[in-house]
């Protein structure tokens, strides 16, 4: 018979092994091996988040190490240096998540790894530090849910104080205080905010001095949420800037030549600056598209934007045909990424190198079962192993 005893001290993990030959044998041997916790952490850091979630079920010892704040923060920091592509497939009202390495040099095919699936979900937000926010039907009610697609953990948020039809939900992050927040925006001067990590899940009403109608795109950059809107009082096109930390709104009036890019394009993070990608078909690109425009906000106070036009290669029309592509964003190596709106076989994503003016495609394998279904692609997804209930 063999038994295994493990203890965790402040700086050292003790593993004791006892081997008993027979009940009648007076001879017993016991060996103890002490392994520093930092070595255990280093081993765990090499595992994917999906495996970390499984390790929590092994023993109290394992979960005590994995739940340490220094471990979860270090795991997230390392994940930031190895970003992934996140794919979300919608089928029969369910969401299915897959991840794939985000290639620094996209010259070869890649395989997507199945993560988790969630039922009766819609209205998906962009990933924020490994987490996603969406709406889901629970007990005939619509609730806001925070989920970790890598571990499968979910947390349903309480009902907002105001239940106006169709409020827009924004999931945002403030990097200085490391706080997640959910913003509900209505067609009025009143909005609601819920802060995660305060120990109490409750909505607060915040005021906005400019009632507005929201547009279709949004992006959070360095603690500021940007989204297009229309001023209800004047009818002007604007960009709303919500400071996540102070919870204050400010507004950028959109110049006439930028209206198409701001309201019909895709807002993105371009090297820490607000930018927009747009084509002749607005936020979509197909075989008929001739070029891509990149607008970058250079000075918010002066409302200065720079415009860059990139001509698509000659083979584009023949290769793409009637396939509809979405703008995903710009990679850290300055490549514009495009992805199909629906799962196709083969499923190719495209990288347009801004500096070399070249286009490359990468085939993503592993999602063939979802052919013909809606798929969303996200850049710079990271794995987060922090338990959701520890964030509130």
Curated annotation (Swiss-Prot):
User: What name has this protein been given in UniProt?
Assistant: F-box protein At5g65850
SMART domains linked to this entry: FBOX
Signal sequence span is: none
What species was this sequence derived from? Arabidopsis thaliana
UniProt xrefs under InterPro entries: F-box-assoc_dom_typ3, F-box-assoc_interact_dom, F-box-like_dom_sf, F-box_dom
Q: Which NCBIfam families match?
A: F_box_assoc_1
* Domain (F-box): residue spans on this chain: 29-78
Q: Which residues form a coiled coil?
A: none
